[in-house]
A protein has these predicted regions:
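Terminal targeting/low-complexity segments that flank the catalytic cores of oxidoreductases
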Residues: 1-116, 139-150, 160, 164, ...
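Alpha-helical transition-metal enzyme core signature, strongest for iron centers
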Residues: 92-100, 122-137, 167-178, 201-216
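A structural signal for long alpha-helical coiled-coils and helix-turn connectors
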Residues: 107-108, 185-186, 217-220
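Active-site-proximal, substrate-binding regions of enzyme catalytic domains
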Residues: 119
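Active-site-proximal alpha-helical scaffolds that flank and shape metal-associated catalytic sites
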Residues: 135-204, 230-245
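Soluble, non-transmembrane catalytic domains of enzymes that act on hydrophobic metabolites at membranes
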Residues: 211-227
């Protein structure tokens, strides 16, 4: 998670000359080297994962906390857990693809001289993650759900603002995913393969999140240092707020409901997204992210 008292950096030269950032990067790079694993030899993929058991913790399902959850039979619960797990890993595949594109565009470019060495660890690990999530989906479900997320308007064509929004989006994505990884890795009701991929992903993402928190703060300080006006700040808040919303909504996939045998998936999605219990669940998933963005001044309590 992000440090509770992330200190401000020297905005204009934050990514090029920041002693604390350099120390963090060295520590994270050393840890990445020490924790390195070959994903192609690490996993002992079983031929199948039984369909008459849970693939995802019931507490993480999109129906949890609603009266609809209580109406599910054991078989329906198992089916929903299977297809919502496939949706979750599919979202990882699509999200990782996008972040790899954005980070690769910036490695060894002006302004990112200092973090570029860590970017190589980051890119390699994320490529591994995309491979094992895709392998899980294809091997045990026969498909990856297509990316149906709502595309946000283009970010403002200002390099500093674009850089900030890119890494803020990456941080949001990683923290949402990590919320699930931690619980799935610890849930003894789940198949060992499910727990294993989530444990390894969390192990790597803990470094990526520590890096992302510091970089996002430094890029935000850069924007403030150059004199970000209130209109631009309002636009940034709105953009990130919409990204938080669309990220959460992507966890509610009508195709997963259909595959689980639940009727009228689009109506079910609308009903669930409006349900008070699900609103509370969303706040729980996002609390680290919104807390961090509030703490550094991107969000405020009145956004």
């Amino acid at each position: 998670m992000c440090p509770p008292n992330t200190p401000p950096g020297r905005a204009a030269t934050a990514t090029a000359d920041d002693t604390e950032f350099r120390t963090l990067l060295d520590r994270l790079s050393d840890k990445a080297t020490a924790d390195y694993y070959n994903p192609f030899t690490t996993f002992d993929w079983p031929a199948t994962i039984p369909t008459d058991e849970l693939w995802m913790s019931p507490e993480l399902l999109s129906l949890h906390g609603t009266e609809l959850m209580d109406e599910l039979s054991t078989a329906q619960l198992q089916a929903l857990s299977r297809w919502e797990s496939v949706n979750f890993y599919s979202l990882n595949v699509h999200g990782i693809r996008e972040l790899l594109i954005e980070v690769t565009r910036r490695v060894h470019t002006p302004g990112f001289e200092l973090p570029s060495e860590f970017f190589h660890h980051f890119i390699g690990e994320e490529n591994d993650h995309m491979w094992f999530f895709a392998t899980f989906c294809l091997k045990y479900a026969g498909k990856i759900y297509p990316d149906k997320s709502v595309k946000l308007p283009e970010a403002p064509r200002d390099p500093d603002i674009e850089n900030f929004l890119v890494f803020a989006r990456i941080l949001v994505f990683e923290q949402i995913v990590d919320h699930y990884n931690v619980q799935l890795a610890a849930d003894r009701r789940l198949h060992p393969t499910v727990r294993h991929i989530n444990r390894l992903h969390h192990q790597d993402e803990s470094r990526h999140i520590a890096f992302g928190c510091r970089l996002v703060h430094l890029l935000w300080e850069r924007l403030l240092d150059r004199g970000l006006d209130e209109a631009a700040r309002h636009e940034l808040r709105g953009y990130l707020g919409r990204y938080l919303t669309t990220s959460i909504e992507s966890l509610y996939n009508p195709a997963a409901y259909r595959d689980a045998g639940l009727p009228d998936g689009f109506a079910l999605r609308r009903r669930l997204l409006a349900h008070p219990a699900r609103q509370a669940a969303h706040a729980k998933v996002l609390h680290k992210t919104t807390g961090f963005l509030n703490r550094i001044g991107v969000f405020d309590d009145h956004r």
